[in-house]
């Protein structure tokens, strides 16, 4: 996927 950092932030936001 593009924007690995964004994906990480999204997961953190979910938590």
Curated annotation (Swiss-Prot):
Transmembrane segments: none annotated. GO terms for biological process: proteolysis. Expressed by the venom gland. Inhibited by PMSF, bovine aprotinin (APR), soybean trypsin inhibitor (STI), and high temperature (85 degrees Celsius). Is not inhibited by EDTA, and beta-mercaptoethanol. One of its GO terms (molecular function) is toxin activity. The keyword Electron transport does not apply. It comes from the Eukaryota. GO terms for cellular component: extracellular space. Keywords: Disulfide bond, Fibrinogenolytic toxin, Hemostasis impairing toxin, Hydrolase, Protease, Secreted, Serine protease, Toxin. The keyword Hydrolase applies. Its main location: secreted. Its EC number is 3.4.21.-. It is found in: Secreted. Belongs to the peptidase S1 family. Snake venom subfamily. Monomer. Snake venom serine protease that cleaves fibrinogen Aalpha chain (FGA), partially cleaves Bbeta chain (FGB) and has no activity on gamma chain. Is less potent than A1 and A2 alpha-fibrinogenases. This is Alpha-fibrinogenase A3. It comes from Crotalus atrox.
């Amino acid at each position: 996927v593009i924007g690995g950092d964004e994906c990480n932030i999204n997961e953190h936001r979910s938590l």
